């Protein structure tokens, strides 16, 4: 009997994943990853975070009802190094990070998989809405989930071949409604539990306040400038802004104004028109080729430049051994440094990288 460690967040998706795997004949072990929590745990509890005490309690109750072993594992140091430190450094560098992607690759997979193999597991499993397939070329790849609205492949694009070969994602074949129906049918107390907060360690979405508290440093204001370098006014610190932003700029120009660029080296935020935030080309690094050995020059794909982006046709161009360009058929709005660009062919994830410009 194959042994699988299921990462259980206390939510309905991972709970049903554990149930489905047990029904399929696996030897299932439930594990909740303790990654971060408030000093008083209060804001995590109020915002339904995946790492508060109530999440552990819910996961433990589900494991008991499924009659599977259950453990809590401490990954706080791994989470701090790979997610929180990265999050802060990216904002300080004028980029807009995606901490969930970093958490998936380096904590939920790299760290959990290593520890699971040490206790004799063959696989790890999660409640993500994605599917894993083996392609004719022998490579493992992600395939979009059965329900497009819940598909989570964008946030999983940088998983390695080794990680994919040892991962199961049983709820990828189901819709969210079907998952809740299964949970209700077998009497799980989390059947109607709301989805968890996306960024668990900034539950109030006050990134600036979090970064000031985390670093112990005050954020330094600077200048708003136009695309020609003329000073337009003062901003409250570059971490408050992201490319494409219009609301909350705190500057009145008598016309619609958008963030075009963030310049950390001069502490400037460039403001322009809506036309200024469209581009037909981006450069990406930190590449992960998934469905192919490497990205080929001239490869045609659909590229997603943010989680809720529908995707747009583009052609991949090799820039160097570590960078590629993506040339779009139609200009794209607010291509944001720090975010992921993920490439698809049909429902298959080809791979992706991090946007640098």
Swiss-Prot record:
The record marks 128, 339 as: Interaction with tRNA. This is tRNA-specific 2-thiouridylase MnmA. HAMAP family: tRNA_thiouridyl_MnmA (MF_00144). It catalyses: S-sulfanyl-L-cysteinyl-[protein] + uridine(34) in tRNA + AH2 + ATP = 2-thiouridine(34) in tRNA + L-cysteinyl-[protein] + A + AMP + diphosphate + H(+). Residues 150-152, 306-307 are annotated as: Interaction with tRNA. The active site is at residues 103, 200. Disulfide bonds join 103-200. Keywords: ATP-binding, Cytoplasm, Disulfide bond, Nucleotide-binding, RNA-binding, Transferase, tRNA processing, tRNA-binding. GO terms for cellular component: cytoplasm. Belongs to the MnmA/TRMU family. The keyword rRNA-binding does not apply.
């Amino acid at each position: 009997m194959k042994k699988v460690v299921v990462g259980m967040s206390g939510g309905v998706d991972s709970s049903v994943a554990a149930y489905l795997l047990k029904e399929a004949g696996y030897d299932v072990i439930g594990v909740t990853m303790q990654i971060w929590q408030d000093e008083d745990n209060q804001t995590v509890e109020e915002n339904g975070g995946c790492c508060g005490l109530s999440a552990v309690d819910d996961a433990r109750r589900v494991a008991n009802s499924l009659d599977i072993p259950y453990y809590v594992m401490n990954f706080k140091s791994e989470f701090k190094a790979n997610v929180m430190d990265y999050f802060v450094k990216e904002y300080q560098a004028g980029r807009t990070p995606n901490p969930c992607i970093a958490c998936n690759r380096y904590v939920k997979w790299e760290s959990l998989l290593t520890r699971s193999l040490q206790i004799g597991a063959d696989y790890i499993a999660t409640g993500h809405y994605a599917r894993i397939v083996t392609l004719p070329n022998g490579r493992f790849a992600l395939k979009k989930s059965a329900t497009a609205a819940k598909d989570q492949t964008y946030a999983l694009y940088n998983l390695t071949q080794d990680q994919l070969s040892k991962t199961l994602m049983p709820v990828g074949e189901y819709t969210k409604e079907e998952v809740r129906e299964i949970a209700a049918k077998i009497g799980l107390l989390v059947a109607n539990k709301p989805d968890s907060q996306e960024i668990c360690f900034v539950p109030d979405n006050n990134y600036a306040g979090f970064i000031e508290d985390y670093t112990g440093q005050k954020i330094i204001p600077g200048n708003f400038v136009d695309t020609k370098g003329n000073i337009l006014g003062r901003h409250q610190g570059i971490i408050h802004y992201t490319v494409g932003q219009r609301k909350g700029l705190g500057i009145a120009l008598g016309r619609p104004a958008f963030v075009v660029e963030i310049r950390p080296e001069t502490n400037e935020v460039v403001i322009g028109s809506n036309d200024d935030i469209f581009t037909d080309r981006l450069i990406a690094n930190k590449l992960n080729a998934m469905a192919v050995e490497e990205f080929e020059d001239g490869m045609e794909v659909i590229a997603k430049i943010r989680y809720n982006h529908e995707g747009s046709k583009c052609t991949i161009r090799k820039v160097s051994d570590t960078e590629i360009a993506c040339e779009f058929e139609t200009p794209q709005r607010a291509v944001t440094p720090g975010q992921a660009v993920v490439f698809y062919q049909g429902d298959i994830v080809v791979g992706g990288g991090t946007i640098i410009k």
